[in-house]
Amino acid sequence: TRDSVMVLMHDLTIDRTTTGKGRVADYTYEELQQFCLVDRDRNVTPYKIPRLKDLLEWGKDKVVFNFDNKYINTRGVSDEVRRASLDYYIKQLQPGGDWSMYHNIMLSVRSVEEALYYWEHGIRNVMFCVEISSMEHFRAYDASPIPWKYIMAYIRLAVNPDLQPVYDLLHAEGVMTMTSITGSSDKVKNPYDRRVAYLRELVAEPDIIETDYPSEFIGLPWSRDAIHALQEAAMRSHRTNLK
């Protein structure tokens, strides 16, 4: 905000997600409180724009927050601004920083170099969510000084059977794998078809699924035993059809 309060807001402007208009940076925190958040259908909610530190406190011991530094891969952002954004994160995470007392933060990083920048500045109280969707990615992180216990592996949009050797290596190191379906199964409009799509995602067995609709997974099988039973049923059906 204009008075240097960090708030939770997806965009640089408040137009899309609130009843107001303009850039976040043009308002003080108190001025932002005159607006309400709106849902994806533009329905006005009673909720206000929250401060980041209030959300961190609310989520302590029950939520893992994924901090995604968008300055790193945004076109037109200078190297100076990128470095400043990294240094800001480091300042907040180092002892005495506003985020340092929270141990439920995961940082999305886009390269070994970015992860190492945090690591070499002594950041040890977060997990790193990194893309590992090839054997080359695995080897790069395996050769880095960052222990695997600090790594969450983003394996892109879906489980790829051709990359099972990579997944096996990750699991052998105790690393969990995560897919993102916000641009695929989440986009299926028909509720029945979307539920079928979610079942397919579950049967593929990523460890974590990133979705915009977590509530729609309620009632779906999520335990390994239940998922394995679905896999076996699908295989039996396939064999029957072949006959």
Regions found by a protein language model. Name each.
Residues V5, H10-H121, N125-C129, A158, ...:
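Metal-dependent phosphodiesterase/phospholipase catalytic core, i.e.
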Residues T1-R2:
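Asp-based phosphoryl-transfer active-site loop
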Residues C129-K243:
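C-terminal active-site rim and adjoining tail of enzyme catalytic domains
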